[in-house]
């Protein structure tokens, strides 16, 4: 089952193997746990880790647990290993009291090195080293192809929030875009973050003409300030503009960008990034390959 179909909430995956059990020590960063070798039951609450497991061919029977990590449910039928990451990492103390728990939160500051390390860790647990090496080699080959296309070129990454666009530098949350793509931010690009206020709430039905005028002027000012910042940013003349909208599908976002007074003029060089891959799953194994394929197509 593809990982992207399982992401309406946190996920639990039950993994089955028929290999004999034996104790195995696992060391990961500052964590050391002892698990059953080739565990037959594992609870996964991290989309990137689930993607890696499925990439390696570890058979999973997965279900959505309603978006909540429920320690009581886990304690009722304890797994042999629990994997957390990202939003669920803060529950480590809760789950460690139930079963051995690993926090596999991706380190996107060292994206490719960390991806390889997490992949090989899981491959070692489940005896999938050969598959892991082949998959990692494929990722490396795709990145080499992409870097040939992007050599010497620049981009800005825009995250859509509250009706505005927040630029992302190499040091921001989505800075791994630059690592994967080989693109750089233009030297003179103003990547300063500005708080993007949400659009104002609808006026009451019986709003006065003065209230309506004030609301209209406030909205016009808000949009004008956003557009002025975009104009200043794009004056750096990036080769590409990557846009990620966490809250809408590609068709809706494309329509919004086409009618935008600033970005509408740059449609030929805009890369519209897949929300599931870039925002929901992130640093998985097959998912990284998908992200690279997306960028290869966009820079062709």
Enumerate the language-model features and the residues they cover.
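Flexible loop/hinge segments that line or gate small-molecule binding clefts
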Residues: 92-121, 272
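Short helix-initiation/N-cap motifs at beta->coil->alpha
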Residues: 28, 65-72, 192-196, 210-230
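Bacterial N-terminal signal peptides
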Residues: 8-18
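A short, structured surface patch at a secondary-structure boundary
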Residues: 41-77, 81-87
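Basic- and aromatic-lined ligand-binding clefts that recognize polyanionic substrates
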Residues: 41-45, 49-53, 132-215
């Amino acid at each position: 089952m593809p990982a992207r179909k399982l992401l309406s909430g946190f996920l639990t995956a039950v993994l089955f193997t028929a290999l004999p059990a034996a104790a195995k020590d696992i060391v990961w960063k500052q964590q050391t746990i002892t698990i059953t070798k080739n565990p037959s039951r594992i609870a996964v609450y991290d989309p990137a880790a689930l993607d890696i497991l499925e990439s390696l061919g570890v058979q999973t029977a997965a279900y959505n647990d309603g978006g909540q990590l429920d320690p009581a449910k886990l304690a009722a039928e304890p797994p042999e290993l629990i994997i957390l990451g990202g939003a669920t990492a803060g529950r480590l103390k809760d789950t460690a009291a139930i079963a051995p728990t690993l926090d596999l939160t991706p380190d996107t500051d060292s994206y490719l090195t960390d991806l390889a390390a997490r992949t090989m860790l899981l491959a070692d647990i489940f005896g999938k080293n050969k598959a892991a090496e082949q998959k990692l080699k494929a990722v490396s080959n795709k990145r080499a192809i992409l870097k040939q296309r992007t050599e010497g070129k620049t981009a800005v990454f825009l995250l859509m929030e509250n009706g505005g666009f927040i630029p992302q530098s190499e040091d921001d949350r989505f800075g791994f875009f630059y690592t994967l793509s080989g693109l750089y931010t233009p030297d003179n690009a103003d990547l300063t973050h500005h708080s993007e206020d949400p659009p104002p709430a609808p006026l009451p039905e019986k709003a006065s003409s003065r209230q309506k005028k004030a609301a209209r002027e406030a909205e016009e000012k808000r949009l004008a300030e956003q557009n002025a910042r975009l104009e200043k940013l794009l004056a750096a003349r990036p080769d590409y503009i990557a846009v990620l909208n966490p809250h809408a599908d590609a068709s809706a976002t494309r329509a919004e960008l086409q009618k935008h007074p600033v970005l509408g003029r740059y449609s030929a060089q805009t890369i519209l990034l897949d929300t599931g891959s870039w925002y929901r799953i992130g640093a998985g194994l097959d998912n990284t390959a998908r992200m690279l394929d997306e960028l290869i197509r966009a820079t062709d």
